Amino acid sequence: MRIILLGAPGAGKGTQAQFIMEKYGIPQISTGDMLRAAIKAGTELGKQAKAVIDAGQLVSDEIILGLIKERIAQEDCAKGFLLDGFPRTIPQADGLKEMGVAVDYVIEFDVADDVIVERMAGRRAHLPSGRTYHVVYNPPKVEGKDDVTGEDLVVRDDDKEETVRARLGVYHSQTAPLIEYYGKEAAESNTKYLKFDGTKQVAQVSADIEKALA
């Protein structure tokens, strides 16, 4: 079961990725984790990536695709894998296709921008412990205070409205075209395109996914 997840930042991909991994016993492949692991292991691609990063440049699609090819050849990917955060662009999707990576399911989580902004702007964090809250969905016992220590909660820079809207802008210009790309792929190949309403309760979205993948 080879799956690609699509959806804007804050659409709930991470939560459902965890569910899919546990339910179907397949690993989540994150390009960031792969890069860090390759650099740490000092592989040939890792060395190339490190040189590029040290020079303050972006790692090329060629290096990322090479890392993915190495990663999916590993034993734990025999039953499949979950690609999260890749592809982000049409050229990356083309590269994956040219490499002969067949995709069984593309799963899109659909959530309106304003809902994502509300979700993320409502997040509060206790930085020393990493505990997170939400003013609406998971409020602390005392407003603005961590449940355990009573220390102040903060809004992380990543969760500020202007940052969220900027990230959504990048998503719409770069990644949203993949929705059309994979919709077309589904019409022409064995890839199935599944779209879920990401505003539903987490358990309901998980149940919908399980039903669709049955």
Swiss-Prot record:
What GO terms fall under cellular component here? Answer: cytoplasm
| Enzyme Commission number, as recorded | 2.7.4.3
- Cite the residue spans of the region called LID: 122-159
Under InterPro entries, the record lists:
Adenyl_kin_sub, Adenylat/UMP-CMP_kin, Adenylat_kinase_CS, Adenylate_kinase_lid-dom, P-loop_NTPase
Q: Where is the signal peptide?
A: none
Q: Which GO terms describe its molecular function?
A: adenylate kinase activity; ATP binding
- Record keyword Kinase present: yes
Q: In which pathway does it act?
A: Purine metabolism; AMP biosynthesis via salvage pathway; AMP from ADP: step 1/1
What SUPFAM superfamilies does its record include? Answer: P-loop containing nucleoside triphosphate hydrolases
Swiss-Prot/TrEMBL keywords: ATP-binding, Cytoplasm, Kinase, Nucleotide biosynthesis, Nucleotide-binding, Transferase
- Cite the residue spans of the region called NMP: 30-59
Residues binding AMP are T31, R36, Q57, L58, V59, G85, F86, P87, R88, Q92, R156, R167
Q: Which reaction does it catalyse?
A: AMP + ATP = 2 ADP
Cross-referenced Gene3D superfamilies: P-loop containing nucleotide triphosphate hydrolases
Family note = Belongs to the adenylate kinase family.
**What is stated about domains?**
Consists of three domains, a large central CORE domain and two small peripheral domains, NMPbind and LID, which undergo movements during catalysis. The LID domain closes over the site of phosphoryl transfer upon ATP binding. Assembling and dissambling the active center during each catalytic cycle provides an effective means to prevent ATP hydrolysis.
State its role. Catalyzes the reversible transfer of the terminal phosphate group between ATP and AMP. Plays an important role in cellular energy homeostasis and in adenine nucleotide metabolism.
Q: What is this protein called?
A: Adenylate kinase
Taxonomic path: Bacteria, Pseudomonadati, Pseudomonadota, Gammaproteobacteria, Vibrionales
Q: Which gene encodes it?
A: adk
